[in-house]
Every structure is written in structure tokens, then in C-alpha cells.
Amino acid sequence: MNTNKIGVLLANLGTPDEPTTPAVKRYLKQFLSDPRVIDLPKFKWQFILNYMILPKRSPKVAKLYREIWTEQGSPLLAISRQQQQALQDYFNRQNQNVLVELGMSYGNPSIESATDRLIKAGVSKIIVLPLYPQYSSTTTASVLDAFARGLTQQRNIVPFEFIHSYHNDPLYIQALANTIRLADDEKLLFSFHGIPKRYQTEGDFYPEHCQKTAQLVADKLSLSNEQWLVTYQSRFGDEEWLQPYTDETLEKLPSQGVKKIAVICAGFSADCLETLEEIAEENKENFLNAGGQSYRYIPALNANTDHINALAKLIEAKI
């Protein structure tokens, strides 16, 4: 063990290995089998998942992935690799003995394999950074579960720090604000990934984090309350999710006099299917068809310099 080497585990959701129906089916099965994501009784849910949902959804989702797939593969994985390399370069420039690895909750590279690589490299401490600014049991807690599984075969558990959230971090807020330039009469919509409403009532304070992030960015931009709003996207199933829903809101706004909209997905650290297809394409079409005149998607922070610096400072505070 190198007593001076620090390991950093960047963690995100994950992606299929390729945009094919079998690969997407494997990915969705792993993702939707996580009780942190779907907490229905296991036997009942597995029957529904395997015999009703996966056969129907896998081909449709694979088609959507093919539309955004790049030469580097999945946008989420490609951008996450860029983030990993940019952070590694940052610590190298600072002459800090830090090794940055990337792991995904679902798919490859797994969090368990990334944890194993860090331990085999002889790190004396691991800093786990889930790339979810707003805490949720459905995302952040799943990272902790996977990290713990990665430690199960280790005789000696190295000390670790777990970054719970950074929804109100000043550098993260500034990085978001730096990407936003509103035109005249343009309204700003913060679209966060939704969770079932029931999860909030059971103690998940994700929506409070989302509201706080949006408020801080709006304050940084000196926006009035009439210039921005928060909605929630990507709902799944019949259960009520956090509202207002992004898609329904965008379809109603033109009739309410909002003709120009800018949409930012502040909870996504990297662009992915939910931003590139659902928000940048599908919801744009819906808004314009409903009478909107201008729709602008503001890309995720991805590997831009402000974002990397914000993440680096979060990590440095734990070294």
C-alpha cells in the first residue's frame, strides 16, 4: 500500500455496452432490478419486468440509443471518460498522488471493478464521488451499495470518504450559471430526473435539493421568480411521480404565453439518453408543435473546465 496515494472513484448510472436489443435488455434488467430504483415486492416485480416490460421496452430503447450513439460509443460513457481523464490531468498538474477511476452502477465499467482496480493500485484511501449533485436514494445510495459490494472480498478495508451531494456547492452553482445566457422573453426551465412521489414522503429529500440548486442558480443570474421554473422528467410506470412533469409543462406553456424556452438539466453531470433524446429532441418537438417559437437545450456541464474544477475542489476537500 502506498500511504501517499489517494484513490478517487467517479460513479455514474451507466449505459448499455452497445445499442442493440440484447445489450439494452441486459442493462435495463440490471437497472430495474435494483430495489433502490424499484422497491416493489421482488417476486411480483421480477415477473412484471421479465415478461412484460423488458420484451416491450428493450427494442424501443435500443432504437433511441442508436440515434445518439457516437464513434466513441455511448455519450454518457464517452463524456464520463473525458471527466475521468480531465480530473486525472488536474491532479497530475498539481503533483498530487491521486488515481482516478470510473465506475457505473449498472453496466460497464462497474463500480465493483473500479474499486478493485484502486485497491490493487495500493491506494491508502478512496474518495467516492457519485456524479449526482442532488442526493437521492435511487442514485447516490445505489452507488454506496455497489461500492460496499466491491469491498466484500477485501480483507483490509481501506478508509474511504463518500461525497453525499453537492447541490449547493458554490463552484457547481457558478459552473451552471456560466452556461446560461437568456435572450429577451426567454424563460428558463430546470428539468430534473423524477422519482416516485412516494419516495419523497418516505424520506428522500431529492426534491428539496433540486429546488435549492435551481434557486441558487436563479439568484446567481438575478432572475425573478417569473423567469424560471422547475419540472421533473423521465417518469416510469403508473405511480405518481414528482410534479410538475416536464413534458406536460412544455406542452402547456405556449398557451400560457411562454413562446421562448431554454431548458437545462442541472442534475445530469453528463449528457445522456434522457437529455439528448428526451429533452433536446422529443420535448423540443412537443413544445414547438404546441405553439412555441424558440426552444433551446443547454448542454450538461460534461467535461467543461468550470465543472472539472468544481469536482476537483470537492475531492481536494476530502484528501
UniProtKB/Swiss-Prot annotation:
PROSITE patterns: FERROCHELATASE. Keywords: Cytoplasm, Heme biosynthesis, Iron, Lyase, Metal-binding, Porphyrin biosynthesis. Its EC number is 4.98.1.1. One of its GO terms (cellular component) is cytoplasm. It is an enzyme of class 4 (lyase). It catalyses: heme b + 2 H(+) = protoporphyrin IX + Fe(2+). One of its GO terms (biological process) is heme biosynthetic process. It is found in: Cytoplasm. Its main location: cytoplasm. Fe cation binds at H193, E274. Pfam families: Ferrochelatase. It comes from the Bacteria. SUPFAM superfamilies: Chelatase. GO terms for molecular function: ferrochelatase activity; metal ion binding. Catalyzes the ferrous insertion into protoporphyrin IX. PANTHER family: FERROCHELATASE, FERROCHELATASE, MITOCHONDRIAL. Belongs to the ferrochelatase family. This is Ferrochelatase. It comes from Actinobacillus pleuropneumoniae serotype 5b (strain L20).
